[in-house]
Each structure stands twice: as C-alpha cells, then as structure tokens.
Curated annotation (Swiss-Prot):
<keyword id="KW-0119">Carbohydrate metabolism</keyword>
<dbReference type="GO" id="GO:0008810">
    <property type="term" value="F:cellulase activity"/>
</dbReference>
<comment type="similarity">
    <text>Belongs to the glycosyl hydrolase 45 (cellulase K) family.</text>
</comment>
<dbReference type="Pfam" id="PF02015">
    <property type="entry name" value="Glyco_hydro_45"/>
</dbReference>
<keyword id="KW-0378">Hydrolase</keyword>
<keyword id="KW-0136">Cellulose degradation</keyword>
<protein>
    <recommendedName>
        <fullName>Endoglucanase-5</fullName>
        <ecNumber>3.2.1.4</ecNumber>
    </recommendedName>
</protein>
<dbReference type="InterPro" id="IPR000334">
    <property type="entry name" value="Glyco_hydro_45"/>
</dbReference>
<feature type="active site" description="Proton donor">
    <location>
        <position position="121"/>
    </location>
</feature>
<dbReference type="InterPro" id="IPR052288">
    <property type="entry name" value="GH45_Enzymes"/>
</dbReference>
<dbReference type="GO" id="GO:0030245">
    <property type="term" value="P:cellulose catabolic process"/>
</dbReference>
<feature type="active site" description="Nucleophile">
    <location>
        <position position="10"/>
    </location>
</feature>
<keyword id="KW-0624">Polysaccharide degradation</keyword>
<keyword id="KW-0326">Glycosidase</keyword>
<dbReference type="InterPro" id="IPR036908">
    <property type="entry name" value="RlpA-like_sf"/>
</dbReference>
Amino acid sequence: ADGRSTRYWDCCKPSCGWAKKAPVNQPVFSCNANFQRITDFDAKSGCEPGGVAYSCADQTPWAVNDDFALGFAATSIAGSNEAGWCCACYELTFTSGPVAGKKMVVQSTSTGGDLGSNHFDLNIPGGGVGIFDGCTPQFGGLPGQRYGGISSRNECDRFPDALKPGCYWRFDWFKNADNPSFSFRQVQCPAELVARTGCRRNDDGNFPAVQIP
C-alpha cells in the first residue's frame, strides 16, 4: 500500500500505552518526566492536568546504516483501527524526496487523532508537537513551530540530552526530508524495536520477518 508521512514529537504518553487497546503481551512503555520507565500502565498522560506519563526518549529513530533505519510512529491505516495497528510493525520504502529508496521499519506506538488514511506520523523529536504539547509540562518545552518543528540541526543542541540523537537523525539519515511518501507492508517486529516498547502483538508471527542489515 502507499502512504504519506509527517513528523511529530508531543512528549505525550503513547496511546498504545494504555491497557486493553489491542491483543498484545503488554502496552507500550511510558516514562516519567525524567525519561525513566514507569510500570503503571494506568498512569495519566502528562498531556492532561496532573498527569505523570510521557513518551520514552528511546522510542525515537536511529540509523542502522545509510539505507536502513528503525523507529516509531503514530499511525492511521485504512480499513483498520487502533486494535489492529497498536504495536504492529511496518516496513516503509520511501518513494519521494532525498530519502527515496531508503527503508525504515517502524512500530506503531500511537494513533493520530488528526491523521488521514495510511498516514504515518513519525516520532521525531523536534518534529513539532502538533495538537498536544506534553513537552512544556515535562521539561519546559521544545523550540520550533507547532507543526513542523525546528528547521536546522543546530537547534537540536538545545534539546534534553536524551532527545538529541533522534533530533539529529532527522538532519542526518533522514536528510531533513519533508513529509516524504512511501510504500509500506506489515512485517514482524524486530527485537530491537520491541526492546524499547516492551510491546509485541499476539499475531506478530503471521507477518514476514525483515532482515536487519
């Protein structure tokens, strides 16, 4: 199938971090304001008043080599719903912009309330907070536009240390691509992604495995 991408990092608890969203072994990990994992899956999101649960800093993208990356996204898949995509993994092959031909495997950790069909909102710190801003209550906020985020690599230097690598990734591996299109297919989740979210779908074995370079 063909899809389109945007980018965001709102610091909020991932929507797949709540119990009973999907047939999975456990919900996606959330973290406290200091980016430490919390074990209470019922903890209120930091994007709500009095909330304590935020996105974990390791649920951000990284390069495996020049042509292959791993990461996470909020998704909205045509003909499916949150029960169908929470913690599912997808192999994206970019088809436009400076990343055309590169591949990325992402795990769905959230659902974009403002997303269209076959839309992947890639988790990229500094990509813009979008509708919700959990970054301001978490650590005082991030620079950049609400939609689209920052515009230059050196702005990443002002980020919390834990979020810098994912911010730099956008300007390095991702070549500051602006919402590139891609083709995608569902695949088995690589262990490298599950290690960061803790979440694997019960039906994960039904999908083709991906060779990580």
